[in-house]
Amino acid sequence: MTQYFRALAFFLLLVPATAMACDGWPSWARGACQRVDQIWNEGGNDLYLTGYSWHNRAMYSSDKIRSFNELAWGGGLGKSIYDEDGDWQGLYAMAFLDSHSDIEPIAGYGFQKIGRIGADTRLGIGYTVFLTSRSDIMSRVPFPGILPLVSAGYRDATLYATYIPGGKGNGNVLFMFGRWEF
């Protein structure tokens, strides 16, 4: 039960930080603060659904692969905008079942350069910067990360993928999730 309270506290600590004014921020950070404030106050609402993680078969034994949960069910909420250049920027908070079927909370910011293919179809490439917490890494102490992010979208739906790098026996996971703009 303690892990659930930690996850809730983790997300609640992020919300007030994004809603505060940027006037007191140092000049070098003010632009980022203003963008986060814009996303939070003007952005559309997003529903995130997670569902699949693929562990690179070349990096794990077949016994280890069988022990992993690759159905990373979960979900979350977010806010996002298409900025003045047509690029996507968003804030999100999700929780899903990790490779060991433990709940993994994650909250962060994503950016993608968007290429349009027709009026309703788009492709994106960018990155996400986040905080997460895992039972098998630092005993659930939240830690930061940055990962590549690719997407394909049609109208209000977008499918995302990222690859978590690693070495032999850790990491090397393709993680896929979806976003519905509403």
From Swiss-Prot:
Disrupted-gene phenotype: Disruption of this gene suppresses the esterified palmitate chain (16:0) in the lipid A and compromises the ability to persist in a mouse after 7 days. However, the mutant is no different from wild-type in its ability to colonize and persist within the respiratory tract during the early part of the infection.
Leading EC class: transferase
Lineage: Bacteria, Pseudomonadati, Pseudomonadota, Betaproteobacteria, Burkholderiales
EC number from the UniProt entry: 2.3.1.251
Induction: The expression of pagP is down-regulated in Bvg-minus phase and up-regulated in Bvg-plus phase.
Entry keyword set: Acyltransferase, Cell outer membrane, Lipoprotein, Membrane, Palmitate, Signal, Transferase
Species whose genome carries this gene: Bordetella bronchiseptica (strain ATCC BAA-588 / NCTC 13252 / RB50)
NCBIfam families associated with the record: PRK11045.1
Entry-linked Gene3D superfamilies: 2.40.160.20
Lipoprotein found in the keyword field: yes
Catalysed conversion reaction: a lipid A + a 1,2-diacyl-sn-glycero-3-phosphocholine = a hepta-acyl lipid A + a 2-acyl-sn-glycero-3-phosphocholine; a lipid IVA + a 1,2-diacyl-sn-glycero-3-phosphocholine = a lipid IVB + a 2-acyl-sn-glycero-3-phosphocholine; a lipid IIA + a 1,2-diacyl-sn-glycero-3-phosphocholine = a lipid IIB + a 2-acyl-sn-glycero-3-phosphocholine
Top-level lineage group: Bacteria
Protein name, as recorded: Lipid A acyltransferase PagP
GO cellular component entries: cell outer membrane
Quaternary structure, from the entry: Homodimer.
